[in-house]
Amino acid sequence: MGENHAEYDIAIIGTGPAGISAAINARIRNKSFILFGNADLSAKVERSHIISNYPALPEISGSELNRRFAAHLEQMDIEITSERITGVYNIGKYFMLLAGQKEYKADAVILATGAQTVNEIKGERELLGKGVSYCATCDGNFY
């Protein structure tokens, strides 16, 4: 394809835990892929005070988990494309992804964009992990 086109086996949208895991697995399986997302990875993970339910990493802070994700991506030579995808179209035998004037073709698309958050209330961010929680069953024991 030309300068404004690129072809991949897999296009991955999202740089949270699911998108990162998909990219690592694509690399291990020698698939051609592109990872779209934020170079800062997951803001939701970053804001998490303590994550207690991630396999093999009990009691890890969100910022430390993001740091480890970034190190793993670097070790695997996985780059993040920061272009925002504005459309995904099923063309039949492949998918066409649009990002501004650029087009990307992929045999498969993995949408790993996470859950939509609601607007924060005043003081929420400052009190996260100090009484404010997003998981009652996970964090109830702390309060």
Descriptions of predicted regions:
Residues 1-11, 80-143:
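FAD-binding core/adjacent interface of flavoenzyme oxidoreductases
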Residues 9-34:
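N-terminal Rossmann-like FAD-binding beta1-loop-alpha1 element of flavoenzymes
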Residues 15, 38, 137:
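Cofactor-binding loop segments of dinucleotide-utilizing enzymes, especially the Rossmann-like FAD-
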